[in-house]
Amino acid sequence: MNHQKERMQMTDASVVSGALSASAEWAAVDWRLVERQVRRLQARIAQAEKTGKAGKVKALQRILAHSFSAKLWATRRVVVNKGRRSPGVDGVLWKTPEEKWIAARSLRARGYRPRPLRRIYIPKKNGKLRPLSIPTMTDRAMQALYLLALNPVAEVRADPNSYGFRPYRSTADALGQCFCVFAKKCSPKVVFDADIKACFDRISHPWLLANVPMDKAILRKWLAAGYVEATVLYPTEEGTPQGGIISPVLANLTLDGLERVAHEAAPGRSLVNVVRYADDFLVTARTPEILNEKVIPAIKTFLAERGLEISEEKSKVTDIETGFDFLGATIRKYDGKLLMTPSRKSVKGFLDSIRGTIKAHAGGAFRELTRLLNPRIRGWANYYRNIVSSRVFTKVDSAIFDAMVRWMRRRHPRKGLSWLRTRYFRSSGHRHWIITAATWKADSSVSYTDLFQASSVPIRRHVKVQAAATAFDPAFRDYFRKLRKTRTQTKAADHTGSFQASAAARRSRQHQPGRVTAASGKA
């Protein structure tokens, strides 16, 4: 009776008001109420899973998956994310409010048949191509809907030190845990840097169907949907499709338990730690023998049960004094002191990409090149802002500066340094040779766009999430509220500092008469 009452509460039209057109209905949705209703039931699912009430978990999941609030929330996720402009095999996109409302109303399990995924290939950093499978909008929304019901269970079951594709967790948290593991004098000396061979493509379908706590009929249809490449339909007999909304959580559920297996293989003072981000993980121990004879064999057995295996070519046992790369960072101890820096591979890949963009923009406007580079430099620097990166940032700035100067000289082979300085540079306080692009406005004023410098990003220690904290557990509600506030304040402080620096730069530029002549045109 209580479940029936909850179903009525979750599926009524309280999130909108009155009898309106489809477009008006979508515009009238109270999204705060929708989110509150969904989050409330997700918390109950997490609590039921935490206390081992499997029957209640299943009943609450069904209520959530059939609720209109969840259908609205799932539809909204699909139409606002960055993949909203990429259609599936049917070529359909939901662009108008009317289409979005009708889509939300049409999401139901009865009679649902997913379409094959559209297979495309995107370039990887190493120049190779990575397959990406794109579901239809309807299939994406259905995955998002059932993910709302699956995620609370996945969070409760998750390994404490799993940091990929989980709420409030990121690579910064994973690297923060690495610091916690290795920074002490009595920290483990030996590391197993592991790589799983084609993890997403090889996960066992029978294992998923037997162990993933969701509607098995729906899951079976997704796994068997296949994909279309060049008008040819290919079956999928293993793996989760890379590109599906629910795929990362399925992969996490597959690998959850690995941390427990590692600890059970070598109990006591073995100094075993596991840090995992999706399918990228490392395991520590006191000696190589503990890893090679106990932990690694146990992990291989664990993975084999799921259709997976360790890549022997890409995995290795090393020590912290030699160092290793993890999530784009080099982690190494020098004379007992732990240093985490951007890896050489990451720095080289980033600079190669920047130089390639500069070279490809040989005939374009300088201001457009600057605007193209700035978000990439800022994003790369922000990724590494939580580790020892200041020296690397300075070197990166120098390399980009040299590449830009070469662009200027190729563009103006007959112009001297004084002319180039007037056209492309400015000074501010003690800083000289700041690369900047000028744009003339309609009122004859000039605006400037400086080339972003990685070294302007302040280095700050990341506030790492507690390993035991799970996002949907009511017991951690206050903790996550404080964590959000702390992280928001840190971002706001950084933004304020950046804004003040920009304002000072603008004031400095106002006192540089005659700095620009025709720099606003195509350089």
Language model segments and positions:
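Extended C-terminal regions of large enzymes
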Residues: 397, 401-403, 408-503
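Phosphate/adenylate-binding "loop-and-lid" substructures adjacent to NTP/NAD/dNTP-binding pockets
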Residues: 57-126
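Conserved polymerase palm-domain catalytic core
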Residues: 106, 110, 157-169, 173-323
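Short, solvent-exposed helix-loop connector elements
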Residues: 131, 235-240, 339, 355-369, ...
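Intrinsically disordered, low-complexity and often Lys/Arg-enriched segments
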Residues: 1-32, 36, 450, 464-523
